[in-house]
Every structure is written in structure tokens, then in C-alpha cells.
Amino acid sequence: MEPLPEPTSRPRLRPRPRCLLLLPLLLLLLLLLPAPELGPREARAEETDWVRLPSKCEVCKYVAVELKSAFEETGKTKEVIDTGYGILDRKASGVKYTKSDLRLIEVTETICKRLLDYSLHKERTGSNRFAKGMSETFETLHNLVHKGVKVVMDIPYELWNETSAEVADLKKQCDVLVEEFEEVIEDWYRNHQEEDLTQFLCANHVLKGKDTSCLAEQWSGKKGDTAALGGKKSKKKSSRAKASGGGSKQRKELGGIEGDPSPEEDEGIQKASPLTHSPPDEL
């Protein structure tokens, strides 16, 4: 009987290091952990150059601007609100609308909608990029389209006049601000109307201890900038019309003086050569 072969000795396996065993577990934990939330600075860094959302300073600045404008518009009336109730009241008590709660409620409820009238003026810097009226860039593009020039842009022509993302966010932040600082606005309305609203609301409360540099930024305007000038052009035209009207009135009164042509003669000259000037030797 042949002897059985001796069993071969198996090589002993070395134990794995503990760090290698823990590595898959650490990777699994990293995958399960939630992503860290971005702070204000990191969130601003994520914004692209094309879309830069309004800061809290810009929001408060234009909320104060529109509040001033709304209170000025509603402060011109002499209406008195009757607060007498019941048939047995002999003397009906009344409150002036300019000092009533109704005026405050109506202004604060509609103030943020007024910000949707603003446009984004990318050619301007700082908080001045928000202003009413069409921006200089889009005004130029509209003029080119009306002249028949083909303008190719990433934004369709139908969306040129739509509310921008920045203005929509301006209105959204306004809703939050007005609700959060409702008591501050009410306190100004009742007790501190002699103080500047921008200083009282923004500098003293909303932006207390924060950056307030945008509050001092003012747009000087450029020549031909309709958004900045507003109604100044019409005023100039009306003043010129008044001056010309006064001159014609004087000419009528002095119609008998030699050298002053009659209206019929003026009309004839205008019809004969509407776009020409007299030579220098004829003057």
C-alpha cells in the first residue's frame, strides 16, 4: 500500500491593512453627504457676467425711490374719509386721506409692481443699471430693425421687451423687503415723514452695518438719453413754443411797422422755399 502524499502547505494570506478596508466606507459616506449650501458670496460667484441679480442695497434703494414717488402722487388730494358709523352719530368724524391708514395700505400693496416698469441698462454701471425707459442698447437695436437691418441675437425679437431676470428678481426681493420691514415703513409714515425715506429705511434699518455705497450713486445722464431725461425734452419744447408764441403775438401787435412781414407774406415764403436758406448777400 502506497503512502499518502503529504499535504502541500498553502501560503498564508497577509491581512489587509485597516486603511484599505475603511476606504470604500469613506467614499460611500462622501456620496451620501448633502452638498454644502452656497453662501451669498459663493452664490454671487456662480452668477454669470450676463445675469447679475440685484443686491440688497439696490433693492432697498429703488423701493425707497418708488415709495417717495407714490406718497408724493397720493399726497396732492384734499379728500377726507368719513369714519362715522351708525345712524345715531350726529357729527360724522373724518380723517384726511393723506394721513389715513388707507393711503399707507394702498401704497405698500402696489409698490413692488411699480418696479416692473424698470429696465436693465447694461451700458451703465452700479445701481444705475436699473432705470425706467428702454435701454440705450435696445433702443439702438430697435432702430436698426425698423430701418430694415437684420439683427441676429440669442434673444428672439418677440422677447426684447419682456421683463429681464434682474428686474423680475428686483420685484421678488421687494416683496420680501416690504413684508419684513412693514413696521419700519409704518413708523416713518406716522412719525418721521420729515426725514429722508432712503436714509431712514435703508441706511438706518435694512442695510444697518452693511454696504450702503449704492445709495449715493446718481445717474448724471447722457445727451439724448431718454430714460434719464424723462420729461425734460417736452419742457424744452413747450418753453420754445411759448417763446415763439410770444414773438408772433408781438408781431401781430406791431403789424403796421415797416419791415415786419404780414402773416400772408410769411406763409407765402414758407410755401415757396420750405427747406432753403437765403444767401448771405441777401441778408
From Swiss-Prot:
Annotated signal sequence range: 1-35
One Gene Ontology biological process: innate immune response
Xref: InterPro entries: DUF3456
Keyword match Chaperone: yes
Intracellular or extracellular location(s): Endoplasmic reticulum
Domain of life (superkingdom): Eukaryota
Glycosylation sites (chain numbering): N161
Annotated keywords: Chaperone, Coiled coil, Endoplasmic reticulum, Glycoprotein, Immunity, Innate immunity, Signal
Molecular function per GO: signaling receptor binding
A single Gene Ontology CC term: endoplasmic reticulum
Pfam families with a match to the protein in the record: DUF3456
Residue runs in coiled coils: 161-187
Domain Saposin B-type: 55-276
Predominant location category: endoplasmic reticulum
Transmembrane region(s): none
Chain spans, region Disordered: 223-283
Quaternary structure, from the entry: Interacts with HSP90B1; this interaction is disrupted in the presence of ATP. Interacts with TLR1, TLR2, TLR4 and TLR9.
Family that this chain belongs to: Belongs to the canopy family.
Entry function: Toll-like receptor (TLR)-specific co-chaperone for HSP90B1. Required for proper TLR folding, except that of TLR3, and hence controls TLR exit from the endoplasmic reticulum. Consequently, required for both innate and adaptive immune responses.
Name of the protein: Protein canopy homolog 3
